[in-house]
Amino acid sequence: MPLRLIKKKRLCRFNPASFLTTGDQIAGTSDWPKLNMTANPEASKHTEKANMAVPHHVAITMDGNGRWAESRGLDVSEGHHAGFENLQRIVADFANRGVAYLTLFAFSTENWDRPESEVNGILELAIAVIAHEAEQLNENGVRIKHLGRVDRLSPELREELELAVKKTENNTGLTLAIAFDYGGRAEIMNAAKELIAEGTPLEEIDESKFAEHLYTADMPDVDLLIRTGGDFRISNFLLWQTAYSELYFSEIMWPDFYGEHVDLAFESFNERKRRFGKRI
């Protein structure tokens, strides 16, 4: 029976137990596989495949859930369900590849303007997934972070996020940052406001000091930014942290972005010459 998580009228049916799919539904897994606990915090790790370097910090704009569903004659909510299932695949895959930080753009500050039924469905689904998955992520050594505002989240979602962050704060495996009610411009503006409120002398403000007031204060800059779904834009995501990121855009919709599509993204990353503004 679907779990009732929000007292108001339900707008999205979801059984959280179904998120832990079988090996037939998610290729090669049954529940959560044992994740790699040895992500190198100092440098990129190399995979066995062609001695491929793995980016230290990967950020993903998970786009295309709605179009994936519509192309199959399904309700948009089913696309979001499929997208969350792929999240499980990707987290396990990236951890096992040696990625140290994975940031997922789950819900933007602008997404509140979508139809109310879709927004409520996403919020309810997020509550169910976080509530049901946090323990297994914790057992696998994953550290969960939340990037974004909390004041507009429902009490249920805020509580689940805070519990997940607290439960996993001392883990040393993959850091999974969930950008929910996140906007890059708002993040930068809030950092500036905090510095002003603290009375920080102007001469003490530099890039390092400013970065301490971002949501990602204890995280490195993004090495590889992936966007699925066929659009070629950043969409207000990690504007500060992607200053020198490599960008990879895929036409594949998010629910189908795994396996060989991840291989292609990492292969593309390995073909880049990262100069960081210098002449090499």
Question: What do the predicted segments below correspond to?
Answer:
Residues P2-L5, F19-L20, D31-I280:
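Flexible, compositionally biased loop and terminal segments
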Residues K8-K9, I26:
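Polybasic, lysine-rich low-complexity intrinsically disordered segments
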